[in-house]
Every structure is written in structure tokens, then in C-alpha cells.
């Protein structure tokens, strides 16, 4: 398993919030508010963890320049990591 994948899986396993956010996004493109609603997490927590997930290349923001209504989706690394974690 490559180093990036190991880091991604470790990051997701170490926080239930990160895992919930990645799982909520899945194959969709969502705003932080939509993610907060789906996960029942507070919006400020969602925003904080999205920033962290973006820094680790698990999610990407499609409209970085927008102040409101930013859209997030999983990167290939994020999709691969969640697939590995849910595979039994």
C-alpha cells in the first residue's frame, strides 16, 4: 500500500468526524451545510475538518473563490480510501 493511502486511512480511522464527512460526500458534490445536515455535525466542525481533508488531498473544493456555497467532492485518493475502509 502506498504512503499516501496509508496516511489517508490513518487520518480517517483516527477521527469519527472525518470518516462521517467522507462517507456523507460519497459520489456527490455537496456544500458544507448539506454535509452538516447529513452528518448531524455542527457546521463549524464540518468546515474545520473539510479544510484538513483538503490539505491531505482527500476532498477538493470546486469553487475555491466563492465565499458562500462552496462545493466539495472526493478526490480519487478519498474515494479509494473510503472504499478500502468499507470493504470487508
Q: Where are the model-predicted features located?
A:
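Short amphipathic alpha-helical interaction segments
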Residues: 41-55
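Short, locally clustered residues in the helix-turn-helix/winged-helix DNA-binding domain
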Residues: 23-27, 86
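Beta-hairpin "wing" of winged helix-turn-helix
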Residues: 56-67
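Short acidic, hydrophobic short linear motifs in intrinsically disordered regions
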Residues: 30-38
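Pre-recognition alpha-helix immediately N-terminal to the DNA-recognition helix
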Residues: 16-23, 80
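Short alpha-helical segments that sit at the start of domains
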Residues: 1-19
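Basic, amphipathic "hinge/linker" alpha-helix immediately C-terminal to the N-terminal HTH DNA-binding motif
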Residues: 66-85
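Short capping segments at the starts of secondary-structure elements
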Residues: 16, 27-31
